[in-house]
Regions:
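Conserved glycine-rich Rossmann-like NAD(P)H-binding loop of the short-chain dehydrogenase/reductase
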Residues: 40-56
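C-terminal helical subdomain
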Residues: 197-198, 205, 213-253
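Active-site helix of classical SDR
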Residues: 133, 173
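Residue(s) in the substrate-gating loop at a strand-loop-helix junction
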Residues: 157
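The beta1-alpha1 cofactor-binding region of Rossmann-like NAD(H)/NADP(H)-dependent oxidoreductases
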Residues: 51-52, 72-83, 115
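Substrate-binding pocket helix/loop in short-chain dehydrogenase/reductase
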Residues: 109-110, 114-122
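Conserved glycine-rich cofactor-binding loop
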Residues: 26-27
Length: 253
């Protein structure tokens, strides 16, 4: 994974071949995508809010011989985002793939939704994404200049394509993710930085536990399906970008 590519007299500094940041990386989609990236040769910075769950994920990947580091961070807080990107830069020096996956959904009628619960969703699901772009842009731009295939994957939702009752703020944040992703392609794709919004329906993760009374987990979209999609994005040539991918369940037969 490491190569000696920068030389100063007799001193050699290690530089990673490819590197990635994944948020919401302690479980579910984030952990599955982080594992795939690490298995395919990326040095991966795992970012998640809960240190205990993050440690468990980190140890599991490390035990499999994968190059990872963990950074506990609440992506809804600007200082945590700045710190996470700085920690990645200090460890790996480059960024080829950024996966903005952290998210939270709080269901409630709009008349009963507190401002605090609105802000948690707005800050975590939406505001964090432009913050990561801003802080990571120098590294992403360097990767784009090098190989024209820097990639940012933003986890949105099917709720970002069709507003959902009792998930109004969640839906609004995911619509925002889709729109922001479109804007970033228009702004940054000429620099070799491509962005894709993932818009899945229910995925079989803990976040969808509330729906499993009516839709069993085995009938939901699987994290492996998301991994396949991200792997496909990584395989595309520099003259192709995919603005969004919508994942739906088959109609009930």
């Amino acid at each position: 994974m490491w190569r000696d590519s920068r030389r100063s007299h007799d001193w050699i500094a290690p530089v990673t071949e490819r590197a990635a940041i994944v948020t919401g990386a302690s479980s579910g989609i984030g952990l599955a995508v982080a594992r795939m990236l690490a298995e395919e040769g990326h040095a991966v910075t795992l970012v998640a809010r809960r240190p205990d769950k993050l440690q468990t994920a980190y140890e599991a990947l490390l035990a499999d011989g994968l190059e990872v580091q963990r950074v506990p961070a609440d992506v809804g807080k600007e200082d945590d985002v700045v710190g996470a990107v700085a920690a990645h830069r200090d460890a790996y020096g480059r960024l080829d793939v950024l996966v903005n996956n952290a998210g939270v959904g709080i269901g409630a009628p709009i008349g009963e939704l507190s401002t605090k619960r609105m802000d948690i969703q707005l800050n975590t699901n939406l505001r964090s994404i432009p913050l990561f772009y801003r802080e990571a842009l120098p590294m992403l731009a360097a990767a784009g200049a090098e190989h024209r295939r820097a990639l940012v994957v933003n986890t949105a939702s099917i709720a970002g394509k069709s507003g959902q009752p009792w998930l109004s703020i969640y839906s609004a944040t995911k619509f925002g993710v889709v729109g922001f992703t479109q804007a970033m392609n228009k702004e940054l794709s000429a620099q070799g930085i491509r962005s894709t919004a993932l818009c899945p329906g229910f995925v079989d993760t803990a976040m969808a536990d509330f729906a499993k009374e009516h839709t069993p987990g085995e009938k939901m979209i699987q994290t492996a399906d998301i991994v396949v999609a991200v792997r496909m994005l990584l395989s595309l040539g520099p003259n192709c970008l995919v603005p969004e991918i919508v994942f739906e369940r088959p109609a009930a037969g």
